[in-house]
Structures are given as structure tokens and as C-alpha cells.
Amino acid sequence: MTRRVFAILALSLSVAVVSAGPSRYGFSDRIERHLFPEVTTGPDNPSWSPDGTWIAFSMQGDIWKIPSKGGEAVALTHGPAYYFEPAWSPDGKSIAFTMDTDGNLDVGVVSSDGGVVTRLTDAREVDLEPAWSRDSQDLFFVSARGGRGFDIFKLHVADRAVTPVVSDPGDQTQPAVSPDGLTLAYVSPVQGKLGTGGIWTRPLAGGPPTLVHYEESEYRMRPHWTPDGKAFLYDSDDMGSNDVAIVPATGGNPFVITNDPMGEFSPAPSPDGASFAFVSNRTGPMTLEIAPIGGGPLGSWRHLAIGPRRAAVPTGLVHATVVDAYGAPMPARIEVKASDGRAYAPDGGFARVIAVSETHYFHATSAFDLDVPAGPLAIEALRGFEYRPATTTVDVKPGATANVTLTLRRLVDAPAMGWYGGDTHAHDLHQGRFGLTHRTLFDESLAEDLHLTNVLIHMDGTRIMGRWADLTGKPDPLSTPTHIMQFAEEFRGSLGHIGMIGIKTYVLPLTGGENNTAYAQVASDVPYLDGARAQGGLAGYMHPYTRASQNPAAPNPAQWDGSLIPVDVALGKGDFYDVESLYSDELGSAEMYYRLLNCGFRLPATGGTDNFPDVWRDPPPGTDRTYAKVSGPLSVASWLAAVKAGHTFGTTGPLIFLTVNGREPGDELQLGASAPTEVTVKVTVSSIAPVDKLEIIVNGVVGPPIPIANTPTYEGTVSVPAGGWVAARVVGPPSKHIADSYAFAQTTPVYVVRNGKTFVSQDDARFLAGVVDAIWARTMRSPWRSDAERAAFKAQIDQAKAVYVRLAGGLPGS
């Protein structure tokens, strides 16, 4: 997909350009999915009333409060805006919050008894994370209005005057005012360290900051002063799961006080200092818990149930069921819009957003219940790319239950033709706040009708993303004969990422080119590409390129120096190439794909999403997927064999079936010297989203667009006088039914061999030789651990360069 924002990590020459995710607010995906507040189906961000009798929290897009000893939960806000991050004023009269309205994040306030919401900020830059001064006259908040990332500002509530408070390099977030009102705590980067920063303090009257505590964090710390001002409660990931920890305000060794295998977040000390509230994801969605200030195991927690509830507007219940054409229950992705314009998800569900279209969704196994504002409710059910979306509208009556059934009918039955859709690049845990289990993960894939989900365990910074023990080389026990989930590995190097699927053991280390670690040097992909093959698996290229040539008439080889793919392919390595991926641009990736094919390399076209299924602001697995034509019953081995043979196409949504003289993608068509120069191309396209055009590609030359909106089947001829390859692709506009940026599908070619000779484009070979030179120019000053390591890497560069020089018939000018 085309990235709207790019986050450049220019830490050294060994660090590649990392593209950011689809952006609603104009920031990287990491910021938008981890720093920014999220819509949750359970309680989040608890905040005590000053007298300790109430706890405010956010849930389902509103601010609620509940007696701290338990009882009825009362909503203080209602749509159409979403409300998050409540902060109870020290005088007890008001609750400030972050609000999402008009496509932006702002700070607002409401009476602690509910009522009219007052929007306090309306700058075009995002404002969030409000924290009160001790006299309840000012709000400290985080904003991008400084133009250099996130800084901390102070807003005087009476006249809305805003003044800067902390404007250091990097992002300053999560402000908290000391009990005596004299010191501000916040989170800010620590030079030379990974993560989003440590806990700092700064006198509000002026003075230098003091680093209290550092650990590799991901916008999760949210420090809160204890009432005596002597310590901070904060969220720690040092033990491999998010836990509440306590550290002295003057610095020192922290203690973890909620050591549970799942995650605990957003600790808030009670006003008397005897206990603290927090949220836990041990059951999946957030639950509200209270524990003694000294912490303790699960048995010492007091669960605060959120029910009964008193909403701010009349509500009703919707009971919905999704079925197939025969009436059998069917898992699906669900999108709803209520009468207030907001999206809702069932209690206990996982509310998520496809950021590229700002579409809210959740997954359902079949039946689900929704408590929503009275009035018309629009519901849509989707299931992958082979079923037509089903939509309906129901009129929700106050206090009543409405029953609705959505029927999903097939657009095409690809498995009946031997084609099975899978994802080469899904993920598991990635620091999201939802308590993702194997069951939840599998149910996501089932609802998306993914027949093979390759879940890649990887490393982000120095932290493992996933569960070490999941990589067994066997399908997960939840798998069925038609829908398989199997864990695999991703190597995240500074010059591209390698996916290893169908493997039994890890190829280590999991990372390379990571500054401030023992693996800061550039790493070769070859051990990973070879390591997967040695185990009987496949290794391929994830999210290859983020953009097409800036000047197609005179492409610059240096633009393509961020990936080792041209080196690896020249060395005979690599089993597949994800033309479609959320974290790359399909047209840009296709441009390099065609150049590699034009040098005689046979590389299957595939698709892999690179989604994070426990993160709320991310698309589902199978957003980008690979269709492989399997011989015999579906299994991991048969699907991988089909990919290896190139019987594939990659897609963001459209299904495209190609034959050339009756041959299918990955096949070879041998023609004699006297055979006709023209071959017959047949293409059939089916798509749940609009598509504009079909294009036939011959030896890298994209043919004239063929309109297919009303004629999904095409038959014609193309000329291949010198042999080479013939492939097809389909392109369409953005669509709410496409979770990537636009509709796109690319087949693997049918390879045409005329008179026994392989077609090679000398121009493309020369260009790729230049790309290899550019890669070495980028990496030659990497912090190599030894001269031998540098020499070994350079030898691979030289070997790849020699391949392209040979294919070009010599250097440029030959």
C-alpha cells in the first residue's frame, strides 16, 4: 500500500528507512496504535475521585464512573464523539479527557455528575493525555502543536490560554503532577537507548530534568505519583508481559507488584495510598481491578464488575446471527454504525479499526449481542474475498431486543478449483492491550476465511513478539482440515525482513542492524534464506518496497538501496516475493519484481499482511493474501509446495485467474523457433470491491488497460517473439471492502521459453548491478564486528554484482 507518512529512523547508515502505517492523524502507525487512546469494550484508564468513593474510566467510547466499592456504572458522555483518558480534578468537580471528534484528538471536560461536554482545545494538531494541576485551574496535556513531535503544554481552563512546558528533543508524553504541585513527571527519550523513553521529573518553577528510571518502553509507562509523593506506579514490560511496577521518585530499583502472565495497565493510586486501580487483559478485554498498594498475586486483587449500567441516552439490544447460504452459523468480520454515528462492539469483544479507511470492526464466531443507542443501526458482515458482503439496517427500540440475521453468499468458490488463500505474513502478540489467546488468534483467521495463516514470531527492539514455544513445525492444535494456523519466524534486518514459513526451529538471531545492541551491524539474509530451506521450509521477502521510481524515465538505483533482495536473488536465494503487503506499495514492489523476472529469475508472486492482531488500530489477518493452487488435499506441505512452484497470485482483494496457452502461473510454456509469436491469454476476475482495469504484463512491459468493470472475463493474444514471461494484474480504487490502500492483484508469470533460450533484459541487469553498488555504498561503514565479517558480506555483494554484469553482457555501454 502507499504510505501516507514515513518515519525515518536515521540512527546510522546501517538502519533502513522504516515506513509508517496508515494514518488518520498524520503520525506513524506505532504512535497511532500505541500512544493514542483506543476504543475498548472493557474499562480503561481508571481515575479516582479525590474522596476515593468513585472511579472514572473509559469504555465503548464514553467516560463512565462507578462506586469504588462496586455498584451501578454511570455514563457521563454520549456520542457522536469518542471519549478516553479521564482525569478527575483535585477539587472533585470535573473530569477532563481526550476526545475524538471531527477527525482529530482534543482535550475536553465534563462535570463529574455528567452533562454538557466542553471542548477545551481545537487546534488542528492532536491534543491528548490531560493531567490536572493541584489547584484544578490548569491542565497539562500532550500535543504536536510545537511542530517537532510531541511536547507538553499547560492550558489555563478559565481563558483557554496555552503555554509550553516541556519541549525537549523527541516525544514528551504522559504528564503527571506531584501531590505538592511543584514537580512534573513525564516520559521522554533517553539518549542512546531503545524504546520510547524513561520516567523524568522537572520542577514546574524551572530547572533541569532528572531521569528517574529507564527501561525499553512502548508508550505504556504512564507514571502516577503515590499520594505521599515518594514513588511512582508505572507500567513495565521488563518481565516479558506488561506489569504494574513501583519505583522511588528519586530513582532506584523498581519492584514488579502485579506479576501475572497476562498484561496489567494504567495503574492509578487511591487517594489514601492504600490501594491502586488498574486494568487487566487476562480474560481478553480489559477488566477493572483494585489491589493493595504493595501489590500481590491475582488472589489479592478485587475485581470491580462493570454492571449494571446507566447509559446517558436510551439504548436497546441487538441480537445478530451470521449464517451461510444454507443457514449454518458462519464466523465473520462485523462492521456497525449506530444512530449516534459511532461504532460499537459486543462486551468482551475486540473493537478494532482499519486505519486506511477508518472502518471500525470486530470478529464474531456467528452470533453476537450489541447494546447500542436507540435508533437505526447499520450492520455489515464480511468474510474474506470469496463471499459477498451482507448488509442490513435494524431499528433499535429503547429497552427492547431486535433480532437480525445476515446471510453470506459466495462470490466464488476458490477451494473447489484447488485455490486456497493464505497469509505469508501474519503476527501474534505485538504489545497490544487486548489479551490475545491462541483461540482468539485462530478465530480472527477463521472469520477472515484464511485457509493457512503463517504466524511469524519476531523481535521488536530487544523484545520477543510472540511466544517462544509456539514454533513447533506443526499446525496449531486448533487447526481444522480446511483452516490451518502454524507458527513460523520473521528475521527483521535493517536491509529488509525475511519470512521463514514451514520451519521447525528458529534461525538466530532474530534481528540485525539494531542500534545499541550486540547486533548493530548489517546482517546478511543468506543464513535465514538457507536456514529455512534446510528445514524443508520456504523463505521469502516481506513488504519489499515502499514506493515506485520517483522518475520512471531515469530511475535512480540508490532509491532501492534499503533492501538486500537484488543481492539475495542473484545468489539464487528466496522462495517467494510479497508483492502485496500493508507495509509496502504494491506498484513499487511490482516494479522491482518485474526487473528481477527480466533477469531470468523465477520468483512466485505472493501476498502477506504484516498485521498485529492484538493491536486495536490494525487491519485483520488476510488483508493481503496469497492464493496457491494446491495439488490434492490442503495441508501445510501441499500449500507450500504450490507456492514454491509459483502456482500463485497475491492480492489485496480481487481474485485473478490466468492462463497462457492453457498454462497456469508458475508453469513453463516451451515454444519452438518456428512457433507463432503470439500466445493466447485468458483472465477471469472476481472481486468484492470495485476494480478499474486489467493489465497484461509481458517481460515487464505493462499493456494497455483493459476495462473489466462489467466484463470480468478477458481473452486475447500477446506477442512474445523472444520468449520471456507473461503475467496479469488488476488494479482498483480504495474501497471500504479493501483493508489495504487500494485493490490490487498480481499473478506469478507463465514462463515462455522459445527455442530453449531464457529471456534476459540487459537494461534491467545493468540497473540491478547499480542497485547492488548502491547497497554497498550504504552499508560499507556499518559497525562491523570484525574485518572477516565485513569481507564475507562484501563477497556476497561482489558475487551478486558479477551475476548482473554477466547477464548484462558487461558493464554499461556493452
Label for each model-derived stretch:
Residues 7-16:
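Bacterial N-terminal signal peptides
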Residues 20-317:
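Sequence signature of WD/YWTD-type beta-propeller architectures
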Residues 116, 141, 154, 161, ...:
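Long luminal/extracellular ectodomains of secretory-pathway precursor proteins
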Residues 1-7:
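Bacterial N-terminal signal peptides that target proteins for export
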Residues 417-605, 609, 615-616:
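Catalytic cores of extracellular degradative/oxidative enzymes
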Residues 146-147, 191-194, 413-416, 492-493, ...:
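Short glycine/serine/proline-enriched coil/turn segments at secondary-structure junctions
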Residues 53, 74, 118, 255, ...:
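Solvent-exposed, polar/charged alpha-helical surfaces in well-ordered, non-transmembrane soluble domains
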Residues 325-342, 348-352, 356-370, 376, ...:
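C-terminal functional module detector
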